Design a protein with these regions (language model features):
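Mid-domain, small-residue-enriched loop/turn segments at the edges of structured enzyme/sensor domains
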Residues: 51-57, 89-126
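Extracellular glycan-interaction surfaces
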Residues: 24
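A penicillin-recognizing enzyme superfamily signal
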Residues: 1-14, 18, 71, 118-284
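Short active-site loop at a secondary-structure junction
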Residues: 1-21, 29, 33-41, 67, ...
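Proline/serine/threonine-rich low-complexity "mucin-like" segments in extracytoplasmic/periplasmic regions
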Residues: 277-319
Length: 319
């Protein structure tokens, strides 16, 4: 049977683990975590897909109502993320993915926010490590260097000591906060068991052919990916097992529990650390119409608004 290094060569659709790329692009271009979007499902974007309608669904067709970007991240609200990608532009999402270290071909199309690209665990780990390092990107390597018994350097991984500041730390602080809410309130809750600050994202591809949890503490990033191959090597729906035998395998099932179990040991002797200081914006109130009290009767006629005054009259926000 052929052998392969699944960490570096095993690839599958990233699903929602790729979603944080779009908020990063948005944060770089003036968007904020308190912006609100329609999180109901399904949602149709007329003409958005090369002139054709684009229909997006949430997992289980769940209606989340009006959500901000923090909740959209915590709950993997596809419809909210799709609207954000429409505003930000899929080309900016693809650019951020490349700068994070994702070498896969992230297409310049609106669906790239939903994680349709095929990625390796190494690529995702590099991306989440860059977020954990507050925008400082490193070159992935397995062995940094080798010296012989005389202390002579016989091997050094290309770029092993190279670090580049790819992103503004303030942008990464906001992204880290949003991802920490996946663990606090979302599908990554099992990761709370490591007993130290944690952030990350669950991901499940179409038809449950792959399931992921990508996460980090202040000092360590780890990715768990799970997929199932058929007799001819093709990826197929993951067969439920263990305590999930009567349900389905998603990123919030075995992957996050495996991640938590591993991290409890791997991070045990590392300083707990803290995520960067970040004060989340106060939620914006939802606008509601109010009635204007009637004017008292007057004998003088009310002057008509000019065309310019009508154009400048306040209007209710559409969202």
């Amino acid at each position: 049977r052929a052998r392969a290094h699944n960490a570096t060569r095993g690839a599958a659709q990233g699903g929602s683990t790729s979603q944080p790329v779009t908020p990063l692009a948005g944060l770089e271009h003036g968007h904020t975590l308190d912006e609100r979007f329609d999180g109901n499902s399904p949602k149709t974007f007329p003409g958005a897909n090369n002139g054709e309608d684009w229909k997006v669904r949430n997992f289980g067709d769940h209606d989340w109502g009006n959500v901000d970007l923090t909740e959209a991240t915590a709950q993997s609200v596809n419809t909210a993320y799709a609207e954000l990608n429409l505003e930000v532009g899929p080309e900016k999402t693809a650019d951020v993915a490349a700068r994070l270290g994702i070498k896969a071909d992230v297409g310049v199309n609106l669906a790239n926010v939903l994680g349709d690209a095929t990625v390796t665990p190494l690529e995702l780990t590099n991306a989440y490590a860059t977020i954990a390092a507050q925008g400082m990107k490193a070159t992935p390597h397995i062995v940094a260097s080798v010296t012989d018994s005389r202390g002579n350097l016989v091997y050094e991984a290309p770029g092993a000591d190279k670090r580049t500041q790819e992103f503004d730390p303030e942008v990464m602080a906001a992204a880290t906060y949003a991802l920490s809410q996946v663990v606090e309130t979302g599908s990554g809750k099992p990761a709370q068991a490591i007993g130290r600050p944690a952030a990350g994202k669950t991901g499940t591809s179409t038809d449950n052919k792959s399931a992921w949890f990508a996460g980090f503490t202040p000092g360590l990033a780890t990715v768990v990916g799970l997929y199932q191959s058929g007799p001819n090597g093709e990826q197929e729906q993951i067969t439920p097992f263990g305590k999930w035998v009567d349900s389905e395998i998603t990123g919030g099932s075995w992957p996050v529990e495996a991640w938590t179990s591993y991290m409890q040991t791997a991070a045990a002797n590392l300083p707990a650390g803290e995520f960067p200081d970040y004060t989340p914006p106060k939620p914006k109130p939802t606008e509601t119409p109010t009635e204007t009290p009637p004017e008292p009767p007057t004998e003088e006629p009310t002057p008509e608004l000019s065309h310019r005054e009508v154009a400048q009259a306040p209007r209710r926000a559409h969202r």
